[in-house]
UniProtKB/Swiss-Prot annotation:
InterPro entries registered for this protein in UniProt: Urease_beta-like, Urease_betasu_sf, Urease_subunit
Signal peptide: none
Subcellular localization, as worded in the UniProt entry: Cytoplasm
Pathway: Nitrogen metabolism; urea degradation; CO(2) and NH(3) from urea (urease route): step 1/1
Gene that specifies this protein: ureB
S-S bonds: none
Lineage of the organism: Bacteria, Bacillati, Bacillota, Clostridia, Eubacteriales
One Gene Ontology MF term: urease activity
Protein name, UniProt field: Urease subunit beta
Gene Ontology CC, one term: urease complex
Amino acid sequence: MIPGEYIIKNEFITLNDGRRTLNIKVSNTGDRPVQVGSHYHFFEVNRYLEFDRKSAFGMRLDIPSGTAVRFEPGEEKTVQLVEIGGSREIYGLNDLTCGPLDREDLSNVFKKAKELGFKGVE
């Protein structure tokens, strides 16, 4: 074996099996391209991406690890999201969530996003 080499079985690998998914339409209302990585909490992506943020809470892009989706200015596209797994805690990013995704009261998270000008928060 070579250091860093992958030895993969010759069979299909199923990712995110059994996790909830969602197709969501996203528009880049900004004047610059925005690239979103595979494991970024989609609710907290760039404030100029407009979509239903409440529906996207606790989800990430359903794409292979290490890849990303790019949204050009004025572009609208539909992406598939998948539930975040693991401990389901989010810290950092745009500093909106900062804690467990499954807490009962999320009103302060949505309020903060709206106050900071994130599009798609009612």
